[in-house]
Amino acid sequence: MPIRIPDQLPASDVLRTENIFVMSESRAASQEIRPLRVLILNLMPKKIETETQFLRLLSNSPLQVNVELLRIDNRPSKNTPTEHLDTFYRQFEMVKGKNFDGLIITGAPLGLVQFEDVIYWDHLKTIMEWAKHHVTSTLYVCWAAQAGLKLLYNLPKKTRKEKLSGVYHHKIHHQYHPLLRGFDDTFLAPHSRYADFSPEFLEEHTDLDILATSDVAGTYLATTKDKRNVFVTGHPEYDSHTLHNEYIRDLGEGMEPAIPINYYPNNNPDNPPCASWRSHGHLLFSNWLNYCVYQQTPYDLDHFSEDAFTKDD
């Protein structure tokens, strides 16, 4: 099934060249079906690149998804044209009266910044609190996962001494959990973060189901019992060259970044990297849309009620 996005969104041309079924708003308006409504709060600096990555994953589903893009505030962006933000992004005031089937909160390059020093921290807290009453399932990615754990469980910020960067092996737990349907016993996924997500720490201080872990990277995938809050500590949405671009950026800024682990052939940055996590990323998002969103959400979003959700699978 298609993904529905605004007719002139730049990502539409990219996705169509990849033979991804993108439906224009005008065509979708003539269909008499109940599409899912998903809101993406894009916290990454390069908005167009990030929105394209997430739309690519959302498109690989038999469900029609109507996507709205949300910006955290109206500050000018150094990496995204103002015209693009004004045309395709909503302010929170424009959506807070609505209900959504799903919310995705992206990562942000704030790994070494204390939460209270994040300029939009109070506004982010407002949005996350709003989501409890207006969104069926929220997917927190990388830095957003750490922020969500702070707000939902009051967990302190834990930071690694060295940045975790590369593609890591993970193993699954709770094999028959809906989010893991179709997963291999082990899989690869990229990480790019300072945050530390120890499985033992999460088990001690939360009631989360920890679904996938790495001996090196720690917790990768966890969810609340009712599947309304899903935490992904890595970047399954990343393109094959995203880690490379970050590595080159850090080199250019005079830093001494380690070469991303298990990423370049022969561990040589001169060799073009290959994405070894693409199928995992598509399956994860398909499962989230199907089992956490579609099969949980009310048909009539105007009758959204927290009481409708149970904590059992």
UniProtKB/Swiss-Prot annotation:
Tell me the Gene Ontology biological-process terms attached to this UniProt entry. Answer: L-methionine biosynthetic process from homoserine via O-succinyl-L-homoserine and cystathionine
Q: Which reaction does it catalyse?
A: L-homoserine + succinyl-CoA = O-succinyl-L-homoserine + CoA
GO annotation, cellular component aspect = cytoplasm
Q: What is its EC class?
A: transferase
Q: Which UniProt keywords apply?
A: Acyltransferase, Amino-acid biosynthesis, Cytoplasm, Methionine biosynthesis, Transferase
Pathway participation: Amino-acid biosynthesis; L-methionine biosynthesis via de novo pathway; O-succinyl-L-homoserine from L-homoserine: step 1/1
Q: Which CDD domains match?
A: GATase1_HTS (cd03131)
This chain's protein is named: Homoserine O-succinyltransferase
Tell me what gene encodes this: metAS
